[in-house]
């Protein structure tokens, strides 16, 4: 009888010990995964900060006269000197076109809010993307608030942003396009995939330089 009781106790202890070990392994796995995610997020944050610095050095072609006269200036110069905010839209041609048509409805808001819109059509290679002048284009592509990438150096920057978007949102980012909202302090305050909510982004840029007590708007 005593032997039976002792055997049962040993068996129960063994099962409890195994359960405890399994739980410890599961907990350690979760801890390791959490640490790895934090490490990846820290690395991604560092990469994005480095990319912000690269963005400031990239040149844009802007319209400076009613006759269509253009000049070239870096993003950093436009931010520091003219206090310009920048919204970059990139993706396939259709995504860029849809975004520019939507932007055209708010063109007065862009003028009043010092916002430049930078379209980057990823369907075109560097040979097809014009480096100077606006040529014969639809009116929504030739508005004064439209700025054009003025060098091939933009390709690497856009590629990095798109790769990050694909990691977070899947391949739909390549199909639907992405938008980046850059305040005139050089900070990228919003990244989004798909249809561009222009009115909300204009308001968010206003909140960035003139914070309201209600806090920032959400990305729609």
Predicted regions and their residues:
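Non-catalytic interaction/Regulatory regions outside core domains
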Residues: 1-220
């Amino acid at each position: 009888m005593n032997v039976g009781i002792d055997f049962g106790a040993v068996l129960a202890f063994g099962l409890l010990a195994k359960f405890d070990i399994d739980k410890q392994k599961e907990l350690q796995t979760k801890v390791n995964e959490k640490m790895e995610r934090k490490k990846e997020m820290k690395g991604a944050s560092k990469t994005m900060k480095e990319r912000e610095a690269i963005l400031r050095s990239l040149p844009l072609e802007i319209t400076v006269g009613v006759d269509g006269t253009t000049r070239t200036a870096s993003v950093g110069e436009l931010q520091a000197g003219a206090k310009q905010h920048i919204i970059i839209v990139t993706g396939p041609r259709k995504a860029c076109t849809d975004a520019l048509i939507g932007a055209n409805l708010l063109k007065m808001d862009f003028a009043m809010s010092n916002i430049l819109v930078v379209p980057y059509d990823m369907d075109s290679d560097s040979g097809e993307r014009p480096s100077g002048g606006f040529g014969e284009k639809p009116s929504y592509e030739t508005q004064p608030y439209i700025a054009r990438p003025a060098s091939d150096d933009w390709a690497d920057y856009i590629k990095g942003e798109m790769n990050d978007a694909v990691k977070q949102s899947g391949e739909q980012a390549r199909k639907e396009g992405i938008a980046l909202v850059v305040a005139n302090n050089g900070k990228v305050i919003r990244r989004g995939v798909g249809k561009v909510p222009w009115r909300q982004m204009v308001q968010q840029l206003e909140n960035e330089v003139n914070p309201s007590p209600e806090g920032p708007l959400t990305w729609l």
